[in-house]
Amino acid sequence: MAFPPRRRLRLGPRGLPLLLSGLLLPLCRAFNLDVESPAEYSGPEGSYFGFAVDFFVPSASSRMFLLVGAPKANTTQPGIVEGGQVLKCDWSSHRRCQPIEFDATGNRDYAKDDPLEFKSHQWFGASVRSKQDKILACAPLYHWRTEMKQEREPVGTCFLQDGTKTVEYAPCRSKNIDADGQGFCQGGFSIDFTKADRVLLGGPGSFYWQGQLISDQVAEIVSKYDPKVYSIKYNNQLATRTAQAIFDDSYLGYSVAVGDFNGDGIDDFVSGVPRAARTLGMVYIYDGKNMSSLHNFTGEQMAAYFGFSVAATDINGDDYADVFIGAPLFMDRGSDGKLQEVGQVSVSLQKASGDFQTIKLNGFEVFARFGSAIAPLGDLDQDGFNDIAIAAPYGGEDKKGIVYIFNGRPTGLNAVPSQILEGKWAARSMPPSFGYSMKGATDIDKNGYPDLIVGAFGVDRAVLYRARPVITVNAGLEVYPSILNQENKTCPLPGTDLKVSCFNVRFCLKADGKGALPTKLDFQVELLLDKLKQKGAIRRALFLHNRSPGHSKNMTISRGGQMQCEELIAYLRDESEFRDKLTPITIFMEYWLDYRTAADATGLQPILNQFTPANVSRQAHILLDCGEDNVCKPKLEVSVDSDQKKIYIGDDNPLTLIVKAQNQGEGAYEAELIVSIPLQADFIGVVRNSEALARLSCAFKTENQTRQVVCDLGNPMKAGTQLLAGLRFSVHQQSEMDTSVKFDLQIQSSNLFDKVSPVVSYKVDLAVLAAVEIRGVSSPDHIFLPIPNWKYKENPETEEDVGPVVQHIYELRNNGPSSFSKAMLHLQWPYKYNNNTLLYILQYDIDGPMNCTSDMEINPLRIKISNSQTSEKNDTVGGQGDRNHLITKRDLTLNEGDVHTLGCGIAECLKIVCQVGRLDRGKSAILYVRSLLWTETFMNKENQNHSYSLKSSASFNVIEFPYKNLPIEDIFNSTLVTTNVTWGIQPAPMPVPVWVIILAVLAGLLLLAVLVFVMYRMGFFKRVRPPQEEQEREQLQPHENGEGNSET
């Protein structure tokens, strides 16, 4: 925001930033203001019409007007640009606005081309107030200069019109000039009248912008006026004086209001000082007799502009004036903890002791400038308490502006607005600023209710909202008898031979209100039986005359007259037609006013008092077998057991809850078993294959994000009832943090008393079970020596130079149901025996979440690995690339001899350690170890003609589970994989005889001939085509424009 400079630094025109400091702020329903057809007024475009507003009620005239300031309007004053106007607007349907002539002259001069004053851009009409025949309008940016100085100073000036007299009032146009005096006073920035016909004027620029309040008597202003005297002294003037430099830049007089705050019956002066106390802001209250200080209020937040607006009215009806203070830049923390500008109004309630109790009212929108204007409304709804309007001129949709109406009450201000007025004009070059100026507390249409004017200077508009007369209705409804006996059927049902149980419904209306209301008021009344039953449900009671649950009636009521009543007969349906006997039958009465017939001559319609409900209801009860008091008090109990004491994580655990429900008291109506089930469980159904268990009707539903199974226990569930039922669930999807699953069970009924059983919680513990196994296989599992065509090579380079491939495969598999997150696999491999190599490891591979390391170098001789390794890895049976040297058992003649077992207890072993990651149910991790049988070792003479069993061993242990809060048992196991090496003799292969081959060929040809003959006899080779019509044959010919056109 822009503010005036300190000390003698000059700006031209001086004082303009101070006036615009408020202007440049960024751009429900008292329920009885008429928002349907408000009176709208418009002024010259760009004139800021609506910057200030007031009512004008001249005592000598029956007509009443609106006063609207347009401070940037052009006038007929010679040589003046945008001098500003105040317009008087007729509130009637004509809605014409005419400028009031306060000053028709141009600038006055000391001499030719030596001006004394400067009226262009003076903002006349920036403030306007009236009292009876008197109108005070000011131009706070009016400039003048003394004959001694050439500099212009914004002292401000006002014009006071009293009846037919119009005088100028410029108390700051004095010899006390310059910034340290009244040279920058901007007199008339804020104004008001007191009850004793004094004028109160604020000049926030006096004394280095300390600010000043000045008050003079209207009679003295008029009597002492002399157009030839520029600086007039008033004998009865009250004014604040200059203070210490610490009070500079405080802006006393920025806003003003009046009210009695010391009980002497004389209006005292209230002024906002928004930059006082190091920009905390203050509000001063001065004695209206001598300008002495009565009370001060200080803001709580720097730069909130506390005191931007002030108002005084008795809001709580205790006959003491209360103070309203606006701080439109106040910031509060939002739900995210961040500061945001919402604005605030402080309401200080005056007590009999003279102290004040302050309550805070924060704005509802960010950057709306809540509290920019505050207007007392008088008693808007005639409830005995004054009301208030608070504006947020940059709130609402597209920043069009909002005015909130708050009602007074004995404890102060109702914090919830009863009505919200919204601007409807879009922004032009600046925001509409709907609500920047407001004035209420005047009954312009004489209907007994005060009205409200709202200005929107950004779109050059002013709006008059008239208050609608309030009608208070007293409605009565009586039902008798209130206890309905279904067995007592005494009323004939029209059109039948049946008799029904009936009861009487008596409904009454009385209406009254203050102000201009018609003597007769038309209402429409609607009655509805069994109101609380949902739409489409069977209503248990009907009216006898129309056999319907509803009845409509038009009633004409005399305003202020006696209660007017009518009576109807209603009856109960037969008990076979409905279930619910326990819930009360609600009889509901609602009424509406016929607003069109109640409107006044101007079309203004009254409104029903919103604080009086527009409906009334009564209840009737069906007589029950529940003792003399007709109140059933059941005693409901539930217990539960299950067929499973433990549930394993990861498994689809079937679980059956055996529930026992019983009632040891009086009947329970619409009784239901409610089972709240955990997220890990799904409802399967009711156990129906047991004679001992009741076959309940159950359904799954979600209630307030709680998953429930609801089972019907009867209506009523009679005294002494015991039910045993089985409910089947599937429990799965347990989380890693769960330790149990919990079911909550309760019996609920619709009874009024003792309607539910205690909640019973049943827990089933969770457990971990992981069936982990390790399996191994050798591929091949036998190798037979000697190997044909194998020759020793001193420096082997390929696999064939060493010997046949031997692959051991180990699979670690989790059969579940639970998962584990970490395990260790230890492999021991028979590597050497007596310094002779046994199984030479070429490489190892893994499949699955596993990482391995070995304690020796793998393939240190860098023997080239065959390309067939991939296929062999996936072949768990064997599969060396060259099977010519492998001989199966049935092909061999074994040499019986000693079998030497070479495992890690005898041979030197290489160790491979693997860390296995998470394995869920059904998952596995596989280790493939590819090696070569070191044939040289077994071809040594001392090792021949022996059988060898080469054994590798693998063991595992699970070391970690993902379940943090459950006890875990150790899981471990081991296995061995054996490769047998055996010496044997390979028999010579026997060739297939030629005659066998010839016979096989002939047999095949004979079979083919037989098949062809059979198919021929069945007509398989005969082709049958359907006849084609001529048109179809023509379509096969090329078209004229087709590719086959012969002319092309």
From Swiss-Prot:
Residues that hold Ca(2+) 2 according to the record: D314, N316, D318, Y320, D322
Binding-site residues, Ca(2+) 3: D379, D381, D383, F385, D387
Domain of life: Eukaryota
Positions of FG-GAP repeats: 32-98, 109-170, 173-225, 237-291, 292-357, 358-415, 419-482
Disulfide bonds: C89-C97, C138-C158, C172-C185, C491-C502, C508-C565, C626-C632, C698-C711, C852-C914, C904-C909
Motif residue range(s): GFFKR motif: 1019-1023
Ranges of the Extracellular topological domain: 31-992
Name used for this protein in its record: Integrin alpha-V
Native organism: Bos taurus (Bovine)
